[in-house]
């Protein structure tokens, strides 16, 4: 269960290879308003400065802790480094926010959950912790197989929806 009234309840929202600029802009706005960090995993289906993405995100870009990662492996390494830094290890953490951002850094819990049509567990039956990562796939094809494999079936969740519909729009 997510407790949105608790100000410490913040997550990492991860978009793997997003394709539609306005959807990503809307998620930027969502993250700015909820205090979540946003991670974009390349390749993106558009340039990071795409006008439609900026327009959909309104003026919230500077209030979002957003990081663009070259690929899934780079993202995982970055998150492991941030955990090591938080625990006092010698490794340097990659910042989870741009230098101009007013957003605060969000610690990583070490737990990643993919939301996928191939998931079997409901997120409503799960207790999320601050710092958890919620991983979403491409708008047209969902989470790539390698990402699903790295998460494992116990960490794939399925949002309830009608049986023959293929996806929900996270940005709505």
Residue positions per predicted region:
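Post-transcriptional modification and biogenesis factors for structured RNAs
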Residues: 1-172
